[in-house]
UniProtKB/Swiss-Prot annotation:
EC main group: hydrolase
Listed InterPro entries: Agmatine_deiminase, Peptidyl-Arg-deiminase_porph
Active site: residue positions: 357
A UniProt-annotated Pfam family: PAD_porph
Keyword Hydrolase: yes
Name used for this protein in its record: Agmatine deiminase
Gene Ontology biological process terms, A to Z: putrescine biosynthetic process from arginine
Lineage: Bacteria, Pseudomonadati, Pseudomonadota, Gammaproteobacteria, Pseudomonadales
Protein task: Mediates the hydrolysis of agmatine into N-carbamoylputrescine in the arginine decarboxylase (ADC) pathway of putrescine biosynthesis, a basic polyamine.
Naturally occurring in which organism (per UniProt): Pseudomonas fluorescens (strain ATCC BAA-477 / NRRL B-23932 / Pf-5)
UniProt entry tagged with the keyword Hydrolase: yes
Keywords associated with the record: Hydrolase, Polyamine biosynthesis
Amino acid sequence: MSTLHSTPRADGFYMPAEWATQTQAWMIWPERPDNWRLGGKPAQAAHAAVAKAIARFEPVTVAVSAAQYENARARLDVPNIRVVEMSSDDAWVRDTGPTFVINASGEVRGVHWGFNAWGGFEGGLYSPWNRDEQVASKVLEIERCQEYRTEGFVLEGGSIHVDGEGTLITTEECLLNHNRNPHLSREEIEAVLREHLAVEQIVWLPDGLYNDETDGHVDNFCCYVRPGEVLLAWTDDPQDPNYPRCQAALQVLENTRDAKGRTFKVHKMPIPGPLYATEEECAGVDAVEGSQERNPSVRLAGSYVNFLIVNGGIIAPSFDDPMDAQAKAILQQLFPEHEVVMVPGRELLLGGGNIHCLTQQQPAPQRI
């Protein structure tokens, strides 16, 4: 399909909210042995569980390497899951896949952001990442969607959340990090977001969750529930390093209006743990120069906020933690018309993210 030389805003396209009706969800099969322990086998089982949970509500497409195609097809042998061969460097389709945009006449296109493995050679998590840079184009080609490119502008899908009504939430820790777009000012970054997502108001939270190796992605910390309402990861423990981060985010949200002039209603989601990898879990990850080291003394950035909204369902991680039941109850209260499905998320967390990070929703065409 063709690459367009205009912008979504100029063409009447915008990024819809995650709760908009979806055609399908995309995933990528995990196998990288220097990120996923034991050659990715435990993560593959967890990944399959997520895909099957989503497939109860809508179709899923899982991209997989040629080497793993037969294995993935066998593990994902349910009617609503399609498996396609696609090369990539890892499984984080939220960050490497396209951001889909729609217009009022029923067309869907995609934005292909620049990608540098969360920091390039200044804190990035692996190298090379050239196959990941091609994922967005490949997805759009398969779906016959036209593509917008942001040459020279790096952004991961997990670093933004939108309400579909003109407001975007992000973090300074990530988007203003020197290892993403050091040549651009805050105002210039905002201009790119406005042109490619058709948003008006950009809400900057200072930081994301403590020790999030993506440099504080907002999708692990704060997300929309509906327009004007957000769910914020939260701790009341002043000794928790997340405490000042939560307080600072709440301060911003309580003193900011969205694009429609609304003040935010903030719901709080307890943070699980603290969670740590075991020595055995870390020992199962291949040690490769240039890749993220796994260390049992480093706290994991576990979060129940890292869930996916699908058609009629909420797919959220559980951690075998005392907070699991409370997290499910909070989500069910906030989404009364959705079925909340908790899927074990520890193996995904050990790899550096969770359900939202490993999925990318494709909105359905909408005619207005």
